[in-house]
Amino acid sequence: MKTQKQQYVTIKGTKNGLTLQLNDDCSFDDLLSGLRELLLLEQYTDGREGHKVNVHIKLGFRYLTEDQEMRLTEAVSENEHLVIHSIESDVMSTEEAKRLKAEAEITSVAKIVRSGQVLYVEGDLLLIGDVNPGGTIRAGGNIFVLGALKGVAHAGCNGNKQAVIAASRMIPTQLRIAQVFNRAPDQKEDGNEMECAYLDIDGNMIIERLQQLAHIRPNLTRLEGGM
């Protein structure tokens, strides 16, 4: 019976270059050998002299060490017409898993953030206390202040546009969500109504009564039972 040769690499041409889908079941050495063999069969040029074709590599559920990634890059670079544009894996590294776990956690802090001080947490911040003018609080997730927010608050500082800022007294010098910022108005009534800030679908920062938060972010329930 004739044995069917295992396919180590599937190549697909796109308008952005070549996509290489790598087999994630075989050994790395077999994969590398199969890749080299396949790339030798064709020149894979776009017809323009001196122009290189972008290669997007999809690893599937395979994790590469730094050495393996370097060897893979060298194998593709042996074809002078190809250049690696991206390498994607469905496997999460330990460092990335730790980062995502930290961003999903709520950190509770009881203190006053005074002028010149910066308080940063990777996930959600629950601050029990005030933020004085000149003080700054930053969080990778949401910010909840049980007190007066009179300084700077930056939620979603790693780019999370779904983050919100809420405070018992919202009289900040500046609010930031992801890369969007909103300076405080020249005059603001010092009321006692709790408020929240969020980005709407157009990326504009909106400040509403805190009661609207349940409608704006209905999935925001991580604080339930945590206070």
From Swiss-Prot:
Coiled coil location: none
Which terms under GO biological process does the entry name?
cell morphogenesis; division septum assembly; regulation of cell septum assembly
Could you tell me the keywords of this UniProt record? Cell cycle, Cell division, Septation
Q: Superkingdom of the source? A: Bacteria
Describe, as the record does, how this protein assembles with itself and its partners: Interacts with MinD and FtsZ.
The similarity comment for this entry is:
Belongs to the MinC family.
NCBIfam families, from UniProt? minC
Q: What does this protein do?
A: Cell division inhibitor that blocks the formation of polar Z ring septums. Rapidly oscillates between the poles of the cell to destabilize FtsZ filaments that have formed before they mature into polar Z rings. Prevents FtsZ polymerization.
Q: What is this protein called?
A: Probable septum site-determining protein MinC
- Can you name the source organism? Bacillus pumilus (strain SAFR-032)
Q: Which gene encodes it?
A: minC
